[in-house]
UniProtKB/Swiss-Prot annotation:
CDD domains: Ribosomal_L1. This is Large ribosomal subunit protein uL1. It comes from Acholeplasma laidlawii (strain PG-8A). Disulfide bonds: none annotated. Belongs to the universal ribosomal protein uL1 family. One of its GO terms (biological process) is regulation of translation.
Length: 230
């Protein structure tokens, strides 16, 4: 893959063979951002897990202390009373059968879907289109709930979902390049601490094999786990 001039210049700003402290890595990620827009900063964890085993297929949600800097569009599938609560909390759209039909016809101008438990059976028919897009509500991530207003508020305030991919990696946004370095660092630590908390008991050996930070289109910066809190 041919890299642009800006990317190649950015790579010269750090040593690829070195794993940096958490804060150093954040500052280098900001410095090496090559995008012309306010790029997203992402952390990637390579975990020693086998996602084919139920207890090692990690999935959940976490509220980042400083949000992600992204405006999140939330839709809520619920009956009229709950739909009203969701709209008051800032949902883009909320409804039941009509909204399900609209989505079934190909409308996907939203980022997260929340649903009340009583609507999940009707939503099931959209599983084939929602599943591959990662939009199907799930109790593990707090997107199947009766408290739709709280769910909408938390998601819009910076609650993110995480899950292991096919090879056991977890990728998560921690904010924008324009964020203060300390805030990005604290967001990264929130995700790290969560992953440590949910380490499966069946994992043998090193749990977190590699940690890297990068920005949209920018190079990856290695983070030393023992110094991630520094």
């Amino acid at each position: 893959m041919k890299r642009g001039k800006k990317y190649l210049e950015a790579v010269k700003l750090y040593d690829k063979s070195v794993a940096y402290t958490g804060l150093e890595a954040v500052e280098l990620a900001k410095k090496t951002s090559v995008a012309k827009f306010d790029a997203t900063v992402e952390v990637a964890f390579r975990l020693n897990v086998d996602p084919r085993k139920a207890d090692q297929n990690l999935r959940g949600a976490i509220s980042l202390p400083h949000g992600t800097g992204k405006t999140v569009r939330v839709v809520v599938i619920a009956k009229p009373e709950k739909a009203k609560e969701a709209l008051a909390a800032g949902a883009l759209e909320a409804g039941d059968v009509e909204l399900i039909d609209k989505i079934g016809k190909g409308w996907f101008d939203f980022d997260v879907m929340v649903a009340t438990p009583d609507m999940m059976a009707q939503l099931g028919k959209l599983g084939r289109v929602l599943g591959p897009k990662g939009l199907m509500p799930n109790p593990k991530t707090g997107t199947v709930t009766l408290d739709v207003a709280k769910a909408v508020e938390e998601i819009k305030a910076g609650k993110i979902e995480y899950r292991t991919d096919k090879v056991g990696n977890i990728h998560a946004p921690i904010g924008k390049v324009s964020f203060d370095s300390n805030k990005l660092h604290e967001n990264m630590l929130a995700i790290y601490n969560q992953l440590v908390r949910i380490k499966p008991a069946t994992v043998k050996g090193t749990y977190i094999k590699k940690i890297a930070l990068s920005t949209t289109m920018g190079p990856g910066i290695m983070v030393e786990e023992n110094n991630i809190k520094k």
